[in-house]
Amino acid sequence: MIKQRTLKQGIKVTGVGLHSGNKVTLNLRPAAANTGVVYCRTDLNPPVSFPADAKAVRDTMLCTALVNDEGVRISTVEHLNAALAGLGIDNIIIEVDAPEIPIMDGSASPFVYLLLDAGIEEQDAPKKFIRVKKKVRVEDGDKWAEILPYNGFRLNFTIDFNHPAITKNLSTYTLDFSAQKFVQQISRARTFAFMKDIEYLQSQGLALGGSLDNAIVLDNYRVLNEEGLRFKDELVRHKMLDSIGDLFMCGYNMIGEFKAYKSGHGLNNKLLRALLEDQEAWEFATFEDKEKVPQGYTVGAQVLI
């Protein structure tokens, strides 16, 4: 039986909030089987919890934010969510003492290594996957995203920026997902921004924690980070990282093929909602026989390093 996963022990880290620029403490704790992914604002009295749910995503400007009916929010959840998806963690309590998850280095890699440091253990309950049964597609102008049946988890993403540093041959990336490929090829890809946008955002009191330490920054001609890029196509890899995190907002790993052109957090969430709302488009899948598990989900997270 393919089993659910949680952490062996809790682990804590401190970082900076991307938008506030303030110190943020993040505490990751194990959770019982069938708990799911639960985000919790511990700075509020009483604390406010947000179970991972596509419908809880109500703000996708610049990041993915969970907002409840009272307007309480947790922003910038997508990179941590991607790390959970990449390692196949089903049950976890995520406590944060601020309205946003710390940005760390702008990628999912710090979260991956935090989770691996805490340790991952299997639980005595079958792991549930969402298996796509028919194609679902959403569009917004020339942007689109779709998910189709596929026996595994494959992703194809294309970006399109009119910028000399983002050439056509660096604008498309395809991944046949596995935990190991996620860690090695996707998790280290950092978020990116253009200098003109950062200056505007900071003038509006946003992105106050943004810097060359936690983002790739481009002017009109080049990448400004002295160390350059971690991959030649790091930008499109990061958009794929975002998509993995956004699709995991349902709390289950996907069995299907995701394709997107110029998609972002909003369109990714629109696709996930459209899929889940169509009862004929998906089903839950569990696997008693490990031999029948789709390619990419067969290797345990313990074999990553």
Curated annotation (Swiss-Prot):
Pfam family, any one:
LpxC
Active-site residues are H265
Q: What is its EC number?
A: 3.5.1.108
Q: Which GO terms describe its molecular function?
A: metal ion binding; UDP-3-O-acyl-N-acetylglucosamine deacetylase activity
Q: Which SUPFAM superfamilies would you find in this protein's record?
A: Ribosomal protein S5 domain 2-like (SSF54211)
Which annotated residues bind Zn(2+)? H79, H238, D242
User: Quick one: signal sequence residues?
Assistant: none
GO terms for biological process, alphabetical: lipid A biosynthetic process
Keyword set, alphabetical order: Hydrolase, Lipid A biosynthesis, Lipid biosynthesis, Lipid metabolism, Metal-binding, Zinc
Per the entry, which co-factors are needed? Zn(2+)
Instruction: Name the pathway it acts in.
Output: Glycolipid biosynthesis; lipid IV(A) biosynthesis; lipid IV(A) from (3R)-3-hydroxytetradecanoyl-[acyl-carrier-protein] and UDP-N-acetyl-alpha-D-glucosamine: step 2/6
* Catalytic activity, reaction form: a UDP-3-O-[(3R)-3-hydroxyacyl]-N-acetyl-alpha-D-glucosamine + H2O = a UDP-3-O-[(3R)-3-hydroxyacyl]-alpha-D-glucosamine + acetate
Q: Which Gene Ontology cellular-component terms appear in the entry?
A: membrane
InterPro entries attached to this UniProt entry: Ribosomal_Su5_D2-typ_SF, UDP-acyl_GlcNac_deAcase, UDP-acyl_GlcNac_deAcase_C, UDP-acyl_N-AcGlcN_deAcase_N
State the function annotated in the UniProt record.
Catalyzes the hydrolysis of UDP-3-O-myristoyl-N-acetylglucosamine to form UDP-3-O-myristoylglucosamine and acetate, the committed step in lipid A biosynthesis.
Task: Family membership, please give it.
Answer: Belongs to the LpxC family.
Q: Which PANTHER family match?
A: UDP-3-O-ACYL-N-ACETYLGLUCOSAMINE DEACETYLASE 1, MITOCHONDRIAL-RELATED
Name-wise, this protein is: UDP-3-O-acyl-N-acetylglucosamine deacetylase
